[in-house]
Amino acid sequence: MFKTYSKSFACILFCIFNIFVVSASAIDLDEATRTVVTDSSGNTTVLTPEQVKRGKRLFNATCGACHTGGITKTNPNVGLDPEALSLATPRRDNISALVDYLKNPTTYDGLESIAEIHPSIKSADIYPRMRSLTDEDLYSIAGHIMLQPKIVAEKWGGGKIYF
């Protein structure tokens, strides 16, 4: 009988612990942190907490295999860090540019389409995970990419010394 009560008590304690710890460990980012550049004119927007969560989930599911931690496994010289995004042609350091890239990816110099070798909406028949993504999904993914340098700083795109 003691075993039954002790197991029940342990289970209840575990559940109570999870309620408080899990809710406290959810990332609560302030508006300043969630503010990201939306276009090449420098306009900004504040991502909602839902967009932040959705962007992270979608990025991990569709992009994370090759871009864990903001690196590019197939080309370590080109990452998703702010400097690399700003030096690309066209610049990809804002949400609308990243959404455009996710629809029609080009080489770093912008001269050739790489839709056949890089997942995109244009190549959804080759990369099925891209098939069901909406514009809002792409916006959330781009928001995640823009937000990460503010959260993990130099680790984002920092390479294998961090990840």
Curated annotation (Swiss-Prot):
Query: In the record, what terms sit under GO molecular function?
Result: electron transfer activity; heme binding; iron ion binding
- The keyword Transmembrane helix belongs to this UniProt entry's keyword annotation: no
GO BP terms, alphabetized = photosynthesis, light reaction; respiratory electron transport chain
What is one term from the GO cellular component aspect held by the record?
photosystem II
Q: Which Pfam families match?
A: Cytochrom_C550
Which InterPro entries would you find in this protein's record? Cyt_c-like_dom (IPR009056), Cyt_c-like_dom_sf (IPR036909), Cytochrom_C550 (IPR029490), PsbV_cyt_c550 (IPR017851), PsbV_cyt_c550-like (IPR016003)
This entry's comment on the bound cofactor is: Binds 1 heme c group covalently per subunit.
Keywords, A to Z?
Answer: Chloroplast, Electron transport, Heme, Iron, Membrane, Metal-binding, Photosynthesis, Photosystem II, Plastid, Signal, Thylakoid, Transport
Which PROSITE patterns does its entry note? CYTC
Quote the subcellular location field of this record. Plastid, Chloroplast thylakoid membrane
* Essential cofactor(s): heme c
Q: Which residues bind heme c?
A: 63, 66-67, 130
Gene3D superfamilies from the entry? Answer: Cytochrome c-like domain
What topology does the record note for this protein and the membrane?
A: Peripheral membrane protein
From the UniProt annotation, give the residues forming the signal peptide. 1-26
Q: Which HAMAP family match?
A: PSII_Cyt550
Which family is this protein grouped under?
Belongs to the cytochrome c family. PsbV subfamily.
Subunit field text: PSII is composed of 1 copy each of membrane proteins PsbA, PsbB, PsbC, PsbD, PsbE, PsbF, PsbH, PsbI, PsbJ, PsbK, PsbL, PsbM, PsbT, PsbY, PsbZ, Psb30/Ycf12, at least 3 peripheral proteins of the oxygen-evolving complex and a large number of cofactors. It forms dimeric complexes.
Chain's role:
One of the extrinsic, lumenal subunits of photosystem II (PSII). PSII is a light-driven water plastoquinone oxidoreductase, using light energy to abstract electrons from H(2)O, generating a proton gradient subsequently used for ATP formation. The extrinsic proteins stabilize the structure of photosystem II oxygen-evolving complex (OEC), the ion environment of oxygen evolution and protect the OEC against heat-induced inactivation.
Q: What protein name is recorded for this chain? A: Photosystem II extrinsic protein V
- Native species: Thalassiosira pseudonana
Q: Which gene encodes it?
A: psbV
